[in-house]
Design a protein with these regions (language model features):
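Exposed, low-structure sequence patches enriched in small/polar residues
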Residues: 1-8, 12-357
Length: 357
């Protein structure tokens, strides 16, 4: 159920205040919003969230209720400010904990400089203090090793980003990310236990700083009717065996575009190539429905090549896609996670018919 009522609306020559009240009944969220337009756009809101995380566990023979739950009621004060100058755009966002159970806070800022010929430079800073997920705090299961009731501190993330757009040359993104008190799932092996009970997946919190550097390059090149759209991501973590990331990720599209039959048909066909370097990809635990860090099996260094045909005839669009068609001749050693093979060759097609243009 969703209710939206305009409570107050004042129109002044230099000051405009809009007050809204939002009520999300089903998930217990209440929002009170004020918009102020003076020397920029200012948004102030009051947010109340009530959550209940419950794990039901009953023992029928003994009529025992072992259910566990987490109840959270939190109030936040949110604010945002934006201002546009002739060549500069400024935007600030903040979410501040006032009182309650979930003590999360965030702040983000963006300054963007616009130059000639659609060139721009953007500087960003983000801060997040986020409570761990409920699944890391509380879990109940018939499996002995999958029961816990934890108290973790907030994970604190600071990131600095630079985005440079040089029209017709390249797009450059540089991100430096620092995470403190990071919480994740890990695989714990017990050599003294036999069979499938010799390991468990448990949540762990690291107190040290984890740092990641990411550099992303994007470039689009056009030679007549031929085009190349390339993206390259280079990333390095200073905390190996804690956060596992591929050092190289590449996505490339090579395609040919043309009009045919006196421009009655627009045709586009080409290849899409995806690749990432070998790394210890996170494993998947079906009991928790969570990914966990593993350092036993490396996955990567296999290309995924797709062949596609797109066509447009007046109001109708057609597409044919042969996904991962190289699977049969590049070796069956591709996985989306340890013990979870990536999909083989797949054919897809579709039709879009617009009745009204």
């Amino acid at each position: 159920m969703f209710v939206k009522d305009v409570v107050i609306q004042l129109n002044l020559s230099v000051l405009i205040i809009l007050v809204y009240f939002y009520c999300f009944v089903n998930n217990s969220r209440f929002i009170f919003v004020i918009y102020i337009y003076k020397f920029g756009k200012f948004n102030l809101s009051l947010l109340y969230i009530s959550d209940r995380y419950s794990l039901e566990n009953y023992q029928i023979d003994d009529f025992v209720d072992n259910s566990q739950n987490i109840n959270s009621k939190t109030t936040y004060l949110n604010g945002s400010y934006s201002k546009e100058f002739p060549k500069i755009k400024l935007k600030l966002n903040t979410e501040n904990f006032i009182f309650g159970d979930n003590q999360s806070n965030s702040f983000s800022s963006i300054v963007k400089f616009n130059f000639k010929n659609d060139n721009s430079l953007a500087l960003k800073y983000n801060f997040y203090s986020v409570a761990p997920s409920y699944n890391t705090l509380l879990h109940s299961s018939n499996y002995e090793n999958y029961n816990w009731d934890n108290e973790f501190d907030n994970s604190v993330t600071n990131s600095i980003s630079l985005n440079l757009i040089l029209s017709n040359i390249l797009d450059l993104d540089i991100d430096l990310i620092s995470v403190k008190k990071h919480v994740q799932f890990e695989k714990l092996i017990d050599d003294n236990s036999p069979g499938i009970n010799n390991y468990s997946i448990i949540p762990v919190q690291y107190l040290d700083n984890l740092e990641v550097l990411k550099i992303k390059l994007a470039r689009k090149i056009k030679f007549g009717k031929f085009s190349i759209d390339s993206k390259l991501l280079l990333q390095k973590t200073m905390s190996d065996n804690i956060i596992n990331l591929p050092e190289i990720v590449s996505r490339n599209t090579f395609y040919y575009s043309t009009d045919m039959f006196k421009k009655a048909l627009y045709l586009q066909t080409g290849l899409g190539v995806k690749y990432f370097s070998k790394f210890y990809m996170n494993g998947y635990d079906p009991l928790l429905s969570e990914l966990y860090v593993q350092n036993e099996k490396e996955i990567g260094e296999f290309p995924i090549i797709d062949f596609f045909i797109n066509a447009k005839i007046q109001q109708t669009r057609l597409y044919f896609k042969f996904e991962h068609f190289n699977s049969s001749f590049t070796g069956y050693s591709y996985y989306s996670a340890p013990n979870y093979p990536y999909r083989d060759f797949t054919f897809r097609f579709g039709l879009v018919w617009n009745f009204f243009m």
